[in-house]
Swiss-Prot record:
<comment type="subunit">
    <text>Homotetramer.</text>
</comment>
<dbReference type="Pfam" id="PF01212">
    <property type="entry name" value="Beta_elim_lyase"/>
</dbReference>
<keyword id="KW-0823">Tryptophan catabolism</keyword>
<keyword id="KW-0007">Acetylation</keyword>
<feature type="modified residue" description="N6-acetyllysine">
    <location>
        <position position="156"/>
    </location>
</feature>
<dbReference type="InterPro" id="IPR015422">
    <property type="entry name" value="PyrdxlP-dep_Trfase_small"/>
</dbReference>
<feature type="modified residue" description="N6-acetyllysine">
    <location>
        <position position="450"/>
    </location>
</feature>
<dbReference type="GO" id="GO:0009034">
    <property type="term" value="F:tryptophanase activity"/>
</dbReference>
<feature type="modified residue" description="N6-acetyllysine">
    <location>
        <position position="115"/>
    </location>
</feature>
<dbReference type="InterPro" id="IPR011166">
    <property type="entry name" value="Beta-eliminating_lyase"/>
</dbReference>
<feature type="modified residue" description="N6-(pyridoxal phosphate)lysine">
    <location>
        <position position="270"/>
    </location>
</feature>
<dbReference type="InterPro" id="IPR013440">
    <property type="entry name" value="TNase"/>
</dbReference>
<dbReference type="InterPro" id="IPR018176">
    <property type="entry name" value="Tryptophanase_CS"/>
</dbReference>
<feature type="modified residue" description="N6-acetyllysine">
    <location>
        <position position="5"/>
    </location>
</feature>
<dbReference type="InterPro" id="IPR001597">
    <property type="entry name" value="ArAA_b-elim_lyase/Thr_aldolase"/>
</dbReference>
<dbReference type="InterPro" id="IPR015421">
    <property type="entry name" value="PyrdxlP-dep_Trfase_major"/>
</dbReference>
<keyword id="KW-0663">Pyridoxal phosphate</keyword>
C-alpha cells in the first residue's frame, strides 16, 4: 500500500445518518432567514457541514465501549481518575480538572491567572496584555471580558497564502519579547501557545519554536498555557517536518511538547474526538495555588472538580479518545484528506492557505477582491457556497476578529479566509470532490457576490449570533 497515490479511509463505517437534499430556492430562503450567518442555519438544512470539527465527527468503537464503564458518582468518580491517569501518561501533567468544553476551562483559568499576577507582581489591569501566536476566538473573548487586551505575535509567513512554510503557526519570538518589554513583564498575566494555530489555517508550531517561547516566558516569570485542541495534529506535523523528531512516536513528541508549558486548556472535541468535553490541567506543584483556585471556580461554574460538567461515561470516553486521536495511521489519513481538498481547489484556481491539520482555508480576499474587508468577503463567500451546494463553512477573518473593545473600531485582520473544516471520520473522498465541484460554480459567479453589513451586532463573539444583509 505504500506506493498507492490515495489510500481509502482507514476505518469501516457501521452507522450512518441520512441527510436531505434541498433546492437552490429553499437554501436562498434559509440563508436570508439566518441573517446571512451560517451559524444560525438549522443542521437539517445543511447537506455537508464544514462549520467545525469540534465534536461533530465519529467516535471509535473503543471510545463508545468505554462509556459503559461510566461511574456517575457526584464526587470521587473512578471515571475521573481514569481520565486523570490518561492526562498524566500522555502529557505528564499532575493535576486535572474536567470541563464541559474548552471555553469552560478558559472562563476558569483566565481570571485566576490575572488575579495571581496582580497580587504577586502588581499587575496594572488598565495596562495588561496577554500574548499568543494567535488566540482562538473564545480565548480572546474570555480575555477581553476580563479586561485583558490580547496581542497576536505571529511570523510574517503565517497569513501569506502565496508562501509555503513548514511551521506557519510559529511565534514571532522577537515580537513576543519586544511586546513583553513594551507593556512591562508584570502586566502580562499569561502567554497562550495555540497548537495548531487555527486562525492561521490549522498551521503547526515547531518544537524548537515552543522551546524558545518557553525560555522567554521563564525569563520574565510568565505562565504559559498550551491551547491543546489539536495537539495530535501538531505532533504529526513535527514528526513529518522537524528532522530531529522524524523517528519519534506521536506519544513521545506530545510528551516533549508539554514540557514547554505550565498549564493546558483543551477543547477535547477536536483531537480527543469526543462530542463534548474539555480539560484544564496543571503541570506540577509550582502552580498548585492556581490549581486550587481553579478547582474552587470549577464548582461554581462547571460542577464538582471530579466531573466538571461531564457525566462519568463521557470522562471514560475522553480518557480513551486522547489515545485514539494519536493513532499514526489515523493522523496520516486525516492530514492527507485535507491536502486532497486543498490540491483540488487550487487546481481549479481557488487560492488556499497551505494545507493544515483540520481544514482547507480558502483565500476569500483573492477570490472576491471587489468586496472590502469591512463588508466581510469570507462571510459573503460562505453564504454563496451554501446557496450553491448546501455546504456550510465558517468565516475566519474580519467578521470573526471583531472590534477593539476600547475604541470600537474594526480590528485589522491579516487575511480574509473561509474555513472548510473536516469533521473526523465523517466525510469521504466523494464528498471532497463534491466540495471542489461546488467551488467551480461559486467561482463562475464570483464577480456578482455582494458584501454584507450588520443588522444586529453583539458586543462579544459577534460571529456566533450576528445577523447581516447584503449591501
Amino acid at each position: 500500500m505504500e506506493n498507492f497515490k490515495h489510500l481509502p479511509e482507514p476505518f469501516r463505517i457501521r452507522v450512518i445518518e441520512p441527510v436531505k437534499r434541498t433546492t437552490r430556492a429553499y437554501r436562498e430562503e434559509a440563508i436570508i432567514k439566518s441573517g446571512m450567518n451560517p451559524f444560525l442555519l438549522d443542521s437539517e438544512d445543511v447537506f455537508i457541514d464544514l462549520l467545525t470539527d469540534s465534536g461533530t465527527g465519529a467516535v471509535t468503537q473503543s471510545m463508545q465501549a468505554a462509556m459503559m464503564r461510566g461511574d456517575e458518582a457526584y464526587s470521587g468518580s473512578r471515571s475521573y481518575y481514569a481520565l486523570a491517569e490518561s492526562v498524566k501518561n500522555i502529557f505528564g501533567y499532575q493535576y486535572t480538572i474536567p470541563t464541559h468544553q474548552g471555553r469552560g476551562a478558559e472562563q476558569i483559568y483566565i481570571p485566576v491567572l490575572i488575579k495571581k499576577r496582580e497580587q504577586e507582581k502588581g499587575l496594572d489591569r488598565s495596562k495588561m496584555v496577554a500574548f499568543s501566536n494567535y488566540f482562538f476566538d473564545t480565548t480572546q473573548g474570555h480575555s477581553q471580558i476580563n479586561g485583558c487586551t490580547v496581542r497576536n505575535v505571529y511570523i510574517k509567513e503565517a497569513f501569506d497564502t502565496g508562501v509555503r512554510y513548514d511551521f506557519k503557526g510559529n511565534f514571532d519570538l522577537e515580537g513576543l519579547e519586544r511586546g513583553i518589554e513594551e507593556v512591562g513583564p508584570n502586566n502580562v498575566p499569561y502567554i497562550v501557545a495555540t497548537i495548531t494555530s487555527n486562525s492561521a489555517g490549522g498551521q503547526p508550531v515547531s518544537l524548537a519554536n515552543l522551546k524558545a517561547m518557553y525560555s522567554i516566558a521563564k525569563k520574565y516569570d510568565i505562565p504559559v498555557v498550551m491551547d491543546s485542541a489539536r495537539f495530535a495534529e501538531n505532533a504529526y506535523f513535527i514528526k513529518q517536518r522537524e528532522a530531529e523528531y522524524k523517528d519519534w512516536t506521536i506519544e513521545q513528541i506530545t510528551r516533549e511538547t508539554y514540557k514547554y508549558a505550565d498549564m493546558l486548556a483543551m477543547s477535547a472535541k477536536k483531537d480527543a474526538m469526543v462530542p463534548m468535553g474539555g480539560l484544564l490541567c496543571v503541570k506540577d506543584d509550582s502552580l498548585f495555588d492556581v490549581y486550587t483556585e481553579c478547582r474552587t471556580l470549577c464548582v461554581v461554574q462547571e460542577g464538582f472538580p471530579t466531573y466538571g460538567g461531564l457525566e462519568g461515561g463521557a470522562m471514560e470516553r475522553l480518557a480513551v479518545g486522547l489515545y485514539d486521536g494519536m493513532n499514526l495511521d489515523w493522523l496520516a489519513y486525516r492530514i492527507a484528506q485535507v491536502q486532497y481538498l486543498v490540491d483540488g481547489l487550487e487546481e481549479i484556481g481557488v487560492v488556499c492557505q497551505q494545507a493544515g491539520g483540520h481544514a482547507a482555508f480558502v483565500d476569500a480576499g483573492k477570490l472576491l477582491p471587489h468586496i472590502p474587508a469591512d463588508q466581510f468577503p469570507a462571510q459573503a463567500l460562505a453564504c454563496e457556497l451554501y446557496k450553491v451546494a448546501g455546504i456550510r463553512a465558517v468565516e475566519i477573518g474580519s467578521f470573526l476578529l471583531g472590534r477593539d473593545p476600547k475604541t470600537g473600531k474594526q480590528l485589522p485582520c491579516p487575511a480574509e479566509l473561509l474555513r472548510l473544516t473536516i469533521p473526523r471520520a465523517t466525510y469521504t473522498q466523494t464528498h471532497m470532490d463534491f466540495i471542489i465541484e461546488a467551488f467551480k460554480h461559486v467561482k463562475e459567479n464570483a464577480a456578482n457576490i455582494k458584501g454584507l453589513t450588520f443588522t444586529y451586532e453583539p458586543k462579544v463573539l459577534r460571529h456566533f449570533t450576528a445577523k447581516l444583509k447584503e449591501v
